[in-house]
């Protein structure tokens, strides 16, 4: 509401859309240090409101679901009335991989994670150790390969502070705005959307696991000072071994991060019919 009032004051009339050119002035009127801080706060508030609303309506729908037998999806993970629950006997504090099993199961079955289950995980689940336990990366990649079905699950984890337990490097990218004409989404949502789109190509490549991991990490450096591509490569050099990737796979993802701007830059700035352009891309 405060931002809306400030926008009206700045523009001088009742408008409902804050354009790029208005953001600096509105940020100043609202007491934010800059427009990035304002847009990040708006994004964070909007996604929280949206998530809470979705949770409420999901509970309403669940209450109308006809009882069916519970289904064991993975160790400690149960599908109950269309929602993902933890078995009462499991202790999240002793099993850091439980979080990934829950998330992967939810995405595969297009199910929401029960709110008390999210609360238990948020309160008790430890950060992923380094290196990850054997098999954890399989659940992680399995989650990402569910494409757009993964996004509501990732949002639920993020709302409860669980996603950064999986990837602590994610925190500076959370709700980070991209104030340009090339991006629709904040950095974090952009990475999720890119990963979901990449997952739809899984049957066209030999290593779909590397495809989705490269998509997830291609802009991971944007939340940090410096050239985001160079920073991202350095980060993936650390992240890959922690996840359990071997040296060759880690370097493949580093190459994806390093060159993710190559083709867009060539397509928009170079003569595609020029043999020198073709040679340059091949050499890169």
Predicted regions and their residues:
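Long, K/E/R/D-enriched contiguous segments that form extended
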Residues: 135-214, 223-229, 234-235, 258
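Divalent metal-dependent catalytic cores for phosphoryl transfer on phosphate-bearing substrates
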Residues: 2, 12, 28-31, 186, ...
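Generic helix-packing signal
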Residues: 7, 57, 110, 198, ...
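Non-catalytic interface/linker regions that flank or bridge core catalytic/transmembrane domains
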Residues: 1-181
């Amino acid at each position: 509401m405060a931002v809306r009032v400030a926008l009206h004051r700045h523009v001088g009339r009742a408008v409902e859309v804050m354009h790029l050119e208005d953001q600096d002035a509105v940020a100043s009127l609202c007491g934010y240090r800059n427009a990035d801080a304002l847009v990040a706060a708006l994004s964070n508030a909007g996604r929280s409101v949206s998530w809470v609303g979705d949770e409420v309506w999901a509970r309403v729908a669940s209450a109308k679901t006809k009882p069916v037998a519970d289904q064991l999806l993975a160790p400690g993970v149960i599908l109950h009335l269309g929602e993902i629950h933890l078995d009462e006997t499991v202790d999240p504090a002793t099993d850091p991989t439980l979080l990934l099993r829950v998330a992967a199961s939810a995405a595969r079955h297009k199910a929401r994670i029960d709110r008390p289950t999210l609360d238990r995980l948020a309160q008790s689940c430890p950060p992923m150790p380094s290196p990850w336990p054997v098999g954890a990366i399989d659940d992680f990649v399995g989650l990402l390969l569910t494409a757009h079905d993964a996004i509501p699950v990732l949002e639920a984890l993020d709302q409860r502070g669980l996603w950064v337990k999986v990837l602590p490097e994610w925190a500076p990218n959370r709700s980070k705005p991209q104030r340009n004409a090339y991006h629709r989404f904040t950095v974090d949502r952009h990475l999720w959307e890119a990963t979901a789109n990449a997952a739809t190509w899984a049957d066209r490549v030999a290593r779909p696991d590397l495809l989705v991991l490269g998509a997830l990490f291609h802009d991971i450096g944007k939340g940090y000072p410096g050239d985001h591509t160079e920073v991202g490569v350095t980060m993936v050099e650390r992240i890959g071994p922690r996840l359990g990737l071997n040296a060759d796979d880690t370097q493949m993802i580093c190459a994806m991060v390093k060159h993710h701007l190559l083709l867009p830059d060539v397509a928009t700035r170079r003569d595609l019919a020029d043999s020198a352009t073709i040679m340059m891309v091949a050499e890169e």
